[in-house]
Amino acid sequence: MDEQEPAPKRGRRFKEQTPVQRALGLLVRREHSRKELNRKLLARGIEPDAAQAAVDRLTDEGWQDDTRFAAAVVRNRAGSGYGPLHIRAELGTHGLDSEAISAALAAFEGDWTENARDLIRRRFGEQGPTDLPQRRKAADLLARRGFEGNSIRAATRFDLED
């Protein structure tokens, strides 16, 4: 019998993606800040000038928007039980300036004190913290989660008639 050479593979040949296509691929999964998107493109081997040009183009075309990104992070983290101090710090790590962060937090339509109370209800039950050690634990939890002092005091007081 003859030994046959294997037939050449007829798989698809993928073109190398452009920097804009790679950035758009990241943005369709979730929102990214300009700094974060640029960093991820650089990590994928895109040249710095090409990465910056791709981010600029997607920003100009409305695919990337730091304001929209900040609002999404605020909504998501507030819904997960985090307070404004934690969210402000996280947005800072994403490279947003303080004005954009303040605007996103100001645009949040929820009530931070009510969010703190909801978190306490989930952790301590509907009656809330009943004695001083539980109130301290609740206050510590809220402080770790980034709530401000006024919200912590109001939430750990836990008078449902407030």
UniProtKB/Swiss-Prot annotation:
Major location category of this protein: cytoplasm
Name of this chain's protein: Regulatory protein RecX
One Pfam family hit: RecX_HTH1
Gene: recX
UniProt keywords, alphabetically: Cytoplasm
InterPro entries documented for this protein: RecX_HTH_1st (IPR053926), RecX_HTH_2nd (IPR053924), RecX_HTH_3rd (IPR053925), Regulatory_RecX (IPR003783), WH-like_DNA-bd_sf (IPR036388)
Source organism of the structure: Xanthomonas axonopodis pv. citri (strain 306)
Protein task: Modulates RecA activity.
GO CC list: cytoplasm
